């Protein structure tokens, strides 16, 4: 009831925000505001809502697809939650130069998972692309992937992919700050491809799927496939079923993490959740460890959370000593892999 009352009170602010975003988009559509065109093909992966949609695993999948196709790739991201400002080189395609505190947890994870990929963070994505073009003029990538850039229209893109969370259709009901929409839903018509992410067998996403198809854009369904349970010392868990866990995370949509654990056959006996991108404190880690010890549980978290914690050696060591694990994930596309791959390759033919 409290949240509903707050949403009602915030409706005037949401209406004003929606008008501002609509005007801004109109000015770009009419060419009054200009978008810079990169000489290197650009693929953007973004959201129309705040919160977790499965965007980061999709970026990782796209980079790995290009790499498997023999296409050198670079990532340019805002680096949400980082303590640095301006343009920063996270990875030169050979060395990881910044951790999660200076690059942002999602960006640091993407760089670590794709060690041959150049990764740059920049609030102004145009400056980030221009920096890498100058810095790596002798080995330019064949394609640049923009992470979280659907609303960042100062840079043009050759393929605009938007991810929508199938598990939370209510997220597209209202504009910020009353809801989670970053811009009016009609903005989806600007996308070239829509990914309905995080579908599950029990998710009631038929209505949302129909709404997305009414944009006239291709819609591909995606689900998160749980991977391996990795001990934070780097070793793999022999079997998921033998682990009784305390699941903890500080992400936008923790229910997706819990679903992945259950799908992987991992028993969840207790949970602890923190705010998305919030730095872990010593007291938070001690509370996790204390609860796990009291109940005889193994702490398990997301790969993104572990990258955030690993930047704090003392906290990381505390979790190593109690056998903490993290779960890897990857997206899969039940009926749209070929369409996604076709569009990604068509970008290179421009």
Swiss-Prot record:
Q: Does this entry carry the keyword Lipid biosynthesis?
A: yes
List keywords of the entry alphabetically.
ATP-binding, Kinase, Lipid A biosynthesis, Lipid biosynthesis, Lipid metabolism, Nucleotide-binding, Transferase
Q: Which Pfam families match?
A: LpxK (PF02606)
GO BP? lipid A biosynthetic process; lipopolysaccharide core region biosynthetic process
**Pathway stated in the Swiss-Prot or TrEMBL entry:** Glycolipid biosynthesis; lipid IV(A) biosynthesis; lipid IV(A) from (3R)-3-hydroxytetradecanoyl-[acyl-carrier-protein] and UDP-N-acetyl-alpha-D-glucosamine: step 6/6
Binding of ATP occurs at: 49-56
Q: What is its EC number?
A: 2.7.1.130
Q: Which GO terms describe its molecular function?
A: ATP binding; tetraacyldisaccharide 4'-kinase activity
What are the record's GO terms for cellular component? plasma membrane
Keyword Oxidoreductase included in the entry's annotation: no
Q: Which reaction does it catalyse?
A: a lipid A disaccharide + ATP = a lipid IVA + ADP + H(+)
For this chain, the family text in UniProt reads: Belongs to the LpxK family.
Question: What is the documented function of this protein?
Answer: Transfers the gamma-phosphate of ATP to the 4'-position of a tetraacyldisaccharide 1-phosphate intermediate (termed DS-1-P) to form tetraacyldisaccharide 1,4'-bis-phosphate (lipid IVA).
Record's protein name: Tetraacyldisaccharide 4'-kinase
The scientific name of the source species is Chlorobaculum tepidum (strain ATCC 49652 / DSM 12025 / NBRC 103806 / TLS) (Chlorobium tepidum)
Please spell out the taxonomic lineage of the organism that makes this protein: Bacteria, Pseudomonadati, Chlorobiota, Chlorobiia, Chlorobiales
């Amino acid at each position: 009831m409290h949240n509903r009352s707050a949403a009602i009170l915030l409706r005037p602010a949401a209406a004003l925000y929606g008008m501002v975003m609509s005007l801004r988009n109109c000015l770009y559509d009419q060419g009054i505001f200009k978008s810079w065109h990169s000489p290197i093909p650009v693929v953007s992966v973004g959201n129309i809502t705040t919160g977790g949609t499965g965007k980061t695993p999709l970026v990782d999948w796209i980079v790995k697809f290009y790499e498997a196709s023999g296409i050198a790739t670079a990532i340019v991201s805002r680096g949400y939650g980082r303590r640095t400002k301006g343009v920063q080189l996270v990875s030169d395609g050979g060395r990881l130069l910044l951790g999660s505190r200076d690059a942002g947890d999602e960006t640091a994870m993407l760089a670590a998972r794709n060690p041959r990929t150049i990764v740059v963070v920049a609030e102004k994505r145009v400056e980030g692309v221009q920096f890498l073009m100058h810095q790596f003029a002798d080995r330019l990538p064949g394609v640049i992937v923009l992470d979280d850039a659907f609303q960042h229209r100062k840079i043009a893109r050759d393929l605009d992919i938007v991810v929508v969370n199938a598990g939370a259709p209510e997220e597209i009901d209202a504009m910020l700050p009353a809801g989670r929409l970053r811009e009016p839903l009609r903005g989806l018509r600007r996308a070239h491809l829509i990914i309905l992410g995080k579908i599950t067998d029990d998710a009631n996403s038929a209505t949302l799927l129909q709404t997305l198809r009414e944009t006239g854009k291709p819609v591909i369904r995606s689900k998160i496939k749980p991977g391996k349970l990795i001990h934070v010392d780097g070793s793999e868990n022999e079997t998921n079923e033998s682990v009784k866990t305390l699941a903890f995370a500080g992400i936008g949509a923790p229910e997706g993490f819990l679903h992945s654990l259950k799908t992987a056959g991992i028993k969840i006996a207790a949970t602890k959740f923190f705010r998305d991108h919030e730095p872990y404190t010593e007291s938070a880690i001690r509370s996790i460890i204390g609860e796990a010890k009291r109940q005889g549980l193994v702490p398990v978290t997301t790969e993104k959370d572990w990258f955030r914690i690993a930047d704090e050696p003392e906290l990381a060591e505390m979790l190593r000593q109690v056998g903490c694990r993290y779960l890897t994930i990857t997206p899969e596309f039940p009926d749209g892999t070929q369409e996604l791959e076709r569009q990604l390759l068509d970008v290179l033919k421009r």
